[in-house]
Amino acid sequence: TPLHHLLLSEKLDTLVMTSANFSEEPICIDNDEALERLSDLADYFLLHNRDIYLRSDDSVVMEMSNTIRPIRRSRGYAPRPIFLKKSGPSILAVGGELKNVVALSKGEKVFLSQHIGDLENLEAYEFFQMTIDHIQRIFEIEPELIVHDLHPEYLSTKWAKDQSLPLFGVQHHHAHLASCMAENNLDEPVIGIIMDGTGYGTDGTIWGGEFLVGDASGFERMAHFEPMPLPGGEAAIKSPWRIGLSYLYQVFGDNLPAIPALENHDIQPIVQMLEARINSPL
């Protein structure tokens, strides 16, 4: 744009570009919203009289072996479809809790939405619902089925269960396997090594680190990391030292060795949680 041309012509040492939003919140799309929400973040605002109709965050790509690989498929890509080998029913897939994207299929085409983000606040959840309404309207597709993550506490899963359509739950790490298969145009069974974090398992425990054998329609869990208590649940994921302490507790019990890296953490309440198995899901 002309604005980019002016900025680059200044020959500044560094230019940092970022979206107009706080972390985990949708980007602002009008002047009043930006001035209200970002007044403590930015010193100056360059405003425009052309309103933005629909949020679409930056796409993120990586160059690998002289090929551009999308890491986050959003502005400039969405809602261009990806193509399936076989035609199927119209399906709405509502994604997971983090880095959410929704998809709507018709025939051999799957229309992916722009990046929505983490569904951890009201603004993001409202954007999630608005995006679903938008893609259904512009493509004039009425889904016959909703596909959701198995995790019962994900907001996307709860939204799906509130609708009056048939549901199909997909295990989180199987979804990763199927996604990689689709990206590489594969049909035959594959070995999937999924080193992902939280994935609600078919056995009701939290999976993480899976060796799966299967295809897009099903899988067998051949090997995995041993389930470990996560003291504090989601808090353990955000504070990995809790997971380290959980491993130490499984080995040493109450006779924990002195670990310099844990000296600045209050470990006793966490040990008590592990002992009593309080708020420490597997």
Residue ranges of predicted features:
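Acidic, glycine-enriched active-site microenvironments
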Residues: 1-282
